[in-house]
A protein has these predicted regions:
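Glycine- and aspartate-rich repeat motifs characteristic of hemolysin/RTX-like Ca2+-binding segments
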Residues: 90, 101, 111, 132, ...
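C-terminal helix/turn sub-motif of individual leucine-rich repeats
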Residues: 96, 115-120, 138, 159-162, ...
Length: 188
């Protein structure tokens, strides 16, 4: 269960989310796990502890909480290009000013909305297994791979994604899929 805010102004991004270690059974010590490719990460875990990770690399960040509760996590750093926040029970993900973000995996959450307009470099998106009713990809012309299966989508317009090569959109309520200008599509 949580809200997320991610900002990359070209030099620094910010990620905020609310995380419940185990919302159904309320067991303590269930780890928070996410993957981020960026540099100079600073993390406030929301439980009085923090971490600093230097260098530009892919970080598999893991934190074990010793108590139950809802934790407000703040992550900041430089030059984010890859973000994996799957399986975190997120209900809100807000991306702001992320011009270098190329890969986003926010699958298996509880998202109802996803605004990707601030991410023009996005090439691969996994937003499957959420509660998305709409998905606007008109600002993502570099998108090559999309997995939007297992949502509540009724229409999907990919006409402004001319580089799209693979599309997974099964198990939705789709009545219309527009693939105009998607000449590179290899898999539907």
């Amino acid at each position: 269960l949580g809200g997320t805010l991610l900002t990359d102004t070209g030099t620094r991004f910010f990620l905020e989310l609310n995380y419940d270690p185990h919302p159904l059974y309320h067991y303590a010590n269930i780890p928070f796990k996410a993957g981020i490719y960026a540099s100079d990460l600073s993390i406030d875990w929301g439980d009085g502890t923090s971490s600093i990770l230097k260098e530009k690399q892919y970080f598999n960040i893991v934190h074990h909480y010793q108590q139950e509760g809802l934790f407000h996590i703040k992550i900041s750093g430089h030059r984010i290009s890859n973000l994996n926040v799957s399986r975190l029970n997120l209900v809100d993900l807000q991306l702001e000013h992320c011009p270098s973000l190329e890969y986003l995996n926010c699958s298996i959450n509880e998202l109802k909305e996803l605004d990707l307009s601030p991410c023009p470099a996005l090439e691969e998106l996994h937003c499957n297994s959420n509660n998305l009713q709409t998905l606007d990809l008109s600002s993502n012309p570099k998108l090559m791979q999309l997995n939007a299966s297992y949502n509540l989508l009724e229409t999907l317009d990919l006409s402004l994604c001319p580089k799209l090569q693979s599309l997974y959109c099964s198990f939705n309520h789709l009545t219309s899929v527009c693939l105009n200008h998607c000449r590179d599509i290899l898999y539907i």
